[in-house]
């Protein structure tokens, strides 16, 4: 697809992500983000509908290893609004694009941009606007577009349009 920002490196991107062996890193990010925004990170032990109150490293560690991740909710634009993380003994629900981008960024090994460049130091996905394809080995391939929250008009497209003399 072509767009005003199709020449920008993050117009389309692809990331390989794998949560195997990254439970400690994922938990650390979740607890850090919980401190900033507790209503957007919820931990649930298996069989419980009530979340863990005031989670700490020990209570989250008791959930065991991460065994899966999946889209839990998408907005009308297709951007991911909630991510479900499945543990051996429970689950976590992660809300807001920033939190989702941080968690999956920790699991991403690399990011290939639209211009073919590869970014290997990924700590956060460029956008919450992506599709998830699960691999047989348990990993995931994330196909995304844009840079930022993934909602509304692309900042890069706006810049290109303004440079071309367009206005509203």
Q: Would you name each region that the model predicts?
A:
Residues 1-168:
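Conserved, single-site charged/polar hotspot
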């Amino acid at each position: 697809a072509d767009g005003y920002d199709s020449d920008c490196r993050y117009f389309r991107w692809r990331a390989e992500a794998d949560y195997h062996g990254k439970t400690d890193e994922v938990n650390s990010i979740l607890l850090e983000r919980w401190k900033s925004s507790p209503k957007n990170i919820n931990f649930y032990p298996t069989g419980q509908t009530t979340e863990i109150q005031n989670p700490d490293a020990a209570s989250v560690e008791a959930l065991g290893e991460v065994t899966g991740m999946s889209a839990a909710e998408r907005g009308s634009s297709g951007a991911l609004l909630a991510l479900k993380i499945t543990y051996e003994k429970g689950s976590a629900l992660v809300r807001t694009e920033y939190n989702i981008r941080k968690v999956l960024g920790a699991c991403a090994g690399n990011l290939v941009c639209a211009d073919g460049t590869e970014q290997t130091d990924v700590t956060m996905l460029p956008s919450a606007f992506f599709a998830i394809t699960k691999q047989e080995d348990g990993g995931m391939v994330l196909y995304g577009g844009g840079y930022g929250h993934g909602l509304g008009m692309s900042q890069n497209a706006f810049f290109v349009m303004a440079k071309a003399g367009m206005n509203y």
